Amino acid sequence: MRRDTFLKSLAALAATGGLPLSALAATNLKMMIPANPGGGWDTTGRALGKALLDGKLADTVTFENKGGAAGALGLAQFVAGSKGDGNAIMVMGAVMLGGLITGKPPVSLSSATPLARLTSEYNVFVLPANSPFKTMKDVIEQFKKDPGSVKWGGGSRGSTEHIAAAMIARQVGVDATKINYVAFRGGGEATAAILGGNVTIGGGGYSEMAEYIAAGKMKALAVTSGARLKGISVPTLKEQGIDVEIGNWRGVF
């Protein structure tokens, strides 16, 4: 979902009382964003904060970023520091679920209360602008030849782009344990690594990459949707003979 569309949608929901957060009737909200600045959770959290202010559901919203371990570090801090605090909320999503399953931290989502699912989107795989590769086929050929030579960059281990890379490996006959996956603490760090050419191929939410794709700073190879996304001329993995489809979602606890 485009960021401007998301903001308008949240503002409309807030104005009509359509967000479950209206039940809090808080004047000063504290929002935990369990990722470093610049990524999808950060964008979602700050857009939500703006919508709550615009909808007069909060007088102030303060944000705290705590990245790492697919959101588990932020979750642990949120649970420990905000127990029983009705004015504390946290952004989360599918990435956190994957991280909790793979990382097995001592904290779980059972310690928090789900409020709303806010957004859904598909991922895109991209190349740095200076990459010697041109297509997904080029990347896959090198990946099959020498899996370790292809650095896949994205969010924390267990993120949807990490899972998608493993699914791609399985589809093309590569042992998923041989994937050279470089995990970052948030989408902002992953984006910087892609722009800097520090990874071979990067993945993340399309909304996070859109401006760089449009500016020619990244080359979009494939989206992880079942069919092409409306208004976006990027082929799906399925179109390119790789039967992989996986989406991402974000919500608030």
Language model regions located:
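Hinge/capping helix and adjacent helix->loop/strand transition within the periplasmic-binding protein
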Residues: 77-88, 100-189, 237, 242, ...
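C-terminal lobe and pocket-closing loops
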Residues: 208-253
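N-terminal export signals
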Residues: 5-24
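Conserved hydrophobic residues forming the short capping helix/wall of the S-adenosyl-L-methionine
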Residues: 49-53, 169, 213
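Solvent-exposed coil/turn segments that connect beta secondary-structure elements
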Residues: 94-96, 120, 130, 207, ...
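N-terminal (or domain-start) structured segment
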Residues: 24-111, 174-203
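Short beta-strand segments
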Residues: 91, 154, 222-223
